[in-house]
């Protein structure tokens, strides 16, 4: 969708750039309320994820990541905004009466027909196993475990590429640049996720960020020593360390957070950039 620029009428709209007007009228049987009281705290009330809290109430849309309506054609009825993700979603009416939401593929319009299964056409929005796809196919919503549903390449504008097939595995290049092996029996959706211009959005004011449930970020160098390792000193002082650290004293800015010796390390041929 196109990016809408506000006319310069107030300071808060001077730098604003939002998505085009996409309405949201979700079906009642495909939504449910979420519990939003954690605010980044654990069961003991201790902050485990900083800078979270507040935000507008949301209703969660049930998204069909499995695409298990096999060999039944479906028609795109609506393209809707989803507050829980930066990609748009489509309401699909299947031939057997089933109604489900899926991620909106780039270029799909209302009235298009999609289908999932084996030996289906290689066209935008169709879901099929990797073994039935030709090399070079652009895909999204990729399964890691057979039957669990898509887990990779689901964000707005995300697209992966099928670059090789050998034995029981297929080699994919993911949006992060990582190259990894996945079972050829796992399914994926053809095409790219829509709303590719999401990175051109500009919230324009602090209140828009608060609507998203994100609180202000305070630099550690302006805190007291009791609050952050970078804090303290007279006036504008350096951090006093060789390298930046987190509030808990661990190395920051570049420290790898992936668990060591994870079982899936053998499937990763090249780490992400």
Curated annotation (Swiss-Prot):
For the keyword Plastid, the answer is yes
SMART domains, per this entry?
Answer: Ribosomal_L2 (SM01383), Ribosomal_L2_C (SM01382)
Q: Which UniProt keywords apply?
A: Chloroplast, Plastid, Ribonucleoprotein, Ribosomal protein
GO BP annotations of the record are: mitochondrial translation
Instruction: Please list where the region (Disordered) is annotated.
Output: 223-273
Q: Can you say where in the cell this protein is located? A: Plastid, Chloroplast
| Stored InterPro entries | NA-bd_OB-fold, Rib_uL2_dom2, Ribosomal_uL2, Ribosomal_uL2_bac/org-type, Ribosomal_uL2_C, Ribosomal_uL2_CS, Ribosomal_uL2_dom3, Ribosomal_uL2_RNA-bd_dom
Name of the protein = Large ribosomal subunit protein uL2c
Organism for this UniProt entry: Calycanthus floridus var. glaucus
